[in-house]
C-alpha cells in the first residue's frame, strides 16, 4: 500500500486588497490573531498567517490549520492579477507534505503539471511548490513542507 502523499490540510490562501483590513476582520469576527507577518518579494505579496486550532501549537502541528491572507505588492504580481480578474477571495489551498522534493517527483510522475519544478521559500520558513490548477479541477494547489 502506498502511504498518502498529503499529510494534512495546511492552509487556505485568500487574496485581499488591504491586508490590515482583512486581519482586523478575521480578528473581530473569529478571534484569530496573526501568527506571522511577512513580505515575500519573490512571490510579490505581503502576507499574514492566522492559526486556526489549538492555542500554542506550532507550524506543522496536527489539528492546526492556517488562513493565509495575501496582499499583492503591485498589480502586476500573480496575486495582483488574480484580484484584477476575479476579485478578492480564495486563491489556493495548501497541503502539508513530509518531503517536498519527493512529493514533486511523485506528482510529476502522474502527469500533473508543476508550476514550480523546484521548491521555493514560503511562509514561516516552509519549502513550497505550486501545482497547475488546470490539472486539479481548477484549484491552484500548494504543497508545503513546514520548517522542521
Language-model features, listed with the residues they occupy:
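Long, hydrophobic N-terminal alpha-helical segment
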Residues: 1-45, 77
Amino acid at each position: 500500500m502506498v502511504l498518502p502523499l498529503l499529510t494534512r490540510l495546511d492552509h487556505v490562501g485568500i487574496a485581499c486588497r488591504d491586508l490590515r483590513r482583512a486581519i482586523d476582520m478575521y480578528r473581530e469576527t473569529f478571534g484569530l490573531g496573526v501568527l506571522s507577518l511577512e513580505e515575500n518579494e519573490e512571490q510579490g505579496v505581503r502576507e499574514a498567517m492566522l492559526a486556526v486550532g489549538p492555542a500554542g501549537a506550532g507550524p506543522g502541528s496536527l489539528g492546526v490549520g492556517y488562513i493565509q491572507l495575501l496582499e499583492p505588492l503591485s498589480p502586476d504580481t500573480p496575486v495582483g492579477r488574480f484580484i484584477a480578474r476575479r476579485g478578492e477571495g480564495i486563491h489556493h489551498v495548501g497541503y502539508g507534505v513530509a518531503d517536498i522534493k519527493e512529493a514533486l517527483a511523485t506528482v510529476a510522475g502522474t502527469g500533473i503539471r508543476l508550476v514550480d519544478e523546484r521548491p521555493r521559500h514560503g511562509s514561516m520558513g516552509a519549502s513550497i511548490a505550486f501545482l497547475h490548477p488546470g490539472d486539479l479541477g481548477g484549484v491552484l494547489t500548494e504543497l508545503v513542507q513546514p520548517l522542521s
